[in-house]
Amino acid sequence: MTDRSPFETDMLTLTRYVMEKGRQAKGTGELTQLLNSMLTAIKAISSAVRKAGLAHLYGIAGSVNVTGDEVKKLDVLSNSLVINMVQSSYSTCVLVSEENKDAIITAKEKRGKYVVCFDPLDGSSNIDCLASIGTIFAIYRKTSEDEPSEKDALQCGRNIVAAGYALYGSATLVALSTGQGVDLFMLDPALGEFVLVEKDVKIKKKGKIYSLNEGYAKYFDAATTEYVQKKKFPEDGSAPYGARYVGSMVADVHRTLVYGGIFLYPANQKSPKGKLRLLYECNPVAYIIEQAGGLATTGTQPVLDVKPEAIHQRVPLILGSPEDVQEYLTCVQKNQAGS
């Protein structure tokens, strides 16, 4: 007979984790406040996603966002939640959202030293069919002494202080990194808290899954076509890779992190500069994947090395297990040499 309690009495919640990280860094507490505010927004979005059908939050709000996507009602709600929560942390000066054409400058009385770039609801085209969706964010320090402006957000991903994503799937999960590896937290509905479920996650060196939208195959460049062919018909006679594609980037990236393999959204004839946005889609997930031991590239350089020129700039994105991404880059180099 055991006296072990069915309840954990010393659990590591995400709130506690963030406070401990802040204490170790001997910081001012601003980043701790900011992360806790972001987590509150994520909990609220998670609740809204679960209630969306009953609360009539499905469907289109009747507008198009700055990057050309139809805006769903949940998008609008999620965007407002993140903006209001992080500004009320008194730790931000500039916000960049997928849903807003211009950068949002925090009012002077609420201003702090951090810049937050976020996609409040990634994969929102999947809302109405109940597929997994998510929230993505990256946090930077303001580097100039000037008045806050859009320019403060135009930093390369190497400057990220913390980044993460929330996945609203069969459970709500947060993947977070503050530069010392990646930790995973699951929302416990009974507690209303995120609880640590996996510490210092590492991606496999090589996986068995490739993930991309093959509906665009007619637009692929030669390198992508060759790489996909190699995965389907391996030259060494080994088993082909499995194909998995949700169409919600957070879901596809998280599966790649957990199972290994490769996720591709390369440039193509239709989108020669890529489709995904650098600041609030590519940089945060590239940071997470690199912190987990993987690679993230545009096909020509590491994603985190790209110096942004505009807040809604698009880039190609290929990420995943290091050996898989390296094999893709070999195809790129081979085709460049032959052209």
Swiss-Prot record:
Region listing for Important for interaction with ALDOA, in residue ranges: 3-10
Q: What is the effect of changing V115M?
A: In CORLK; decreased activity; decreased sensitivity to allosteric inhibition by AMP; decreased thermal stability
Gene name linked to the record: FBP2
GO CC terms, sorted? anchoring junction; cytoplasm; cytosol; extracellular exosome; nucleus; plasma membrane; Z disc
- Which sites bind Mg(2+) 3? D119, D122, E281
Which co-factor is required? Answer: Mg(2+)
| Catalytic reaction equation(s) | beta-D-fructose 1,6-bisphosphate + H2O = beta-D-fructose 6-phosphate + phosphate
* Other known facts: Specific for the alpha-anomer of the substrate.
Q: Which organism is it from?
A: Homo sapiens
Q: Which residues bind AMP?
A: V18, T28, G29, E30, L31, T32, K113, Y114, R141
Phosphotyrosine: modified positions: Y216, Y219
Q: Where are the transmembrane segments?
A: none
Protein name, please? Fructose-1,6-bisphosphatase isozyme 2
